[in-house]
Design a protein with these regions (language model features):
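A conserved structural/catalytic subdomain of Rossmann-like adenosyl-cofactor enzymes
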Residues: 3-175
Length: 175
């Protein structure tokens, strides 16, 4: 809906949003949806310069995912690892809400170059709106994986036994 209050709700959501993107043409419309984007919307840079970073649009996707989950919904979203320690107002509001409301279940910091074609270090946040645990499992998988080349790109991939270790840690709530 245009006001952001009547979103379709889902049992499960998995999202891989763009991290940086400009949307100056629709910024005002998006920013007006305060129920949907309760932590805020990133500001438009004063002068859009192709050499400078674009807007942190992933913060909008993160809020959208949380608002689109049913009360018993579960979800996962890929985010830049820097989100967890960000001092930015919007990121801090989102992090505070998902921890205080006990929405976030866990976070895995992934190895660099493991994901798509981005050089950005990424983490995966897991949500479970049906649980109300006081604990969030944090897994540092940033040193795992093996290097390989794909064309001219140096990449990293998790091996099956490492994936099993991560799954086991989540199931047993061990970091």
């Amino acid at each position: 809906s245009d006001d952001g209050k009547s979103l379709k709700q889902f049992d499960f959501i998995v999202s891989n949003p763009p991290f940086k993107l400009d949307f100056p043409d629709t910024h005002a419309k998006v920013a007006a949806q305060t129920a949907r984007f309760w932590a805020g919307v990133p500001n438009i840079p004063p002068k859009i310069d192709p050499k400078k970073p674009k807007m942190a649009i992933y913060t909008c996707f993160l809020q959208h995912v949380i608002n689109s989950l049913k009360d018993t919904g579960k979800g996962a979203i890929v985010i830049p690892t820097g989100f967890i320690t960000s001092k930015n107002r919007i990121e801090k509001r989102i992090l505070t809400k998902i921890v205080d409301d006990k929405i976030v279940y866990g976070c895995i910091s992934m190895p660099s170059n493991v994901f798509a074609t981005t050089g950005t270090n990424v983490s995966v946040l897991f949500f479970d709106k049906s649980q109300s645990s006081d604990k969030v499992i944090l897994i540092d998988a940033s040193k795992l994986g093996e290097e390989y080349k794909e064309g001219t790109n140096q990449k990293r991939r998790l091996r099956n036994f490492e994936i099993d270790q991560i799954i086991d840690a989540f199931r047993n709530k061990k970091s």
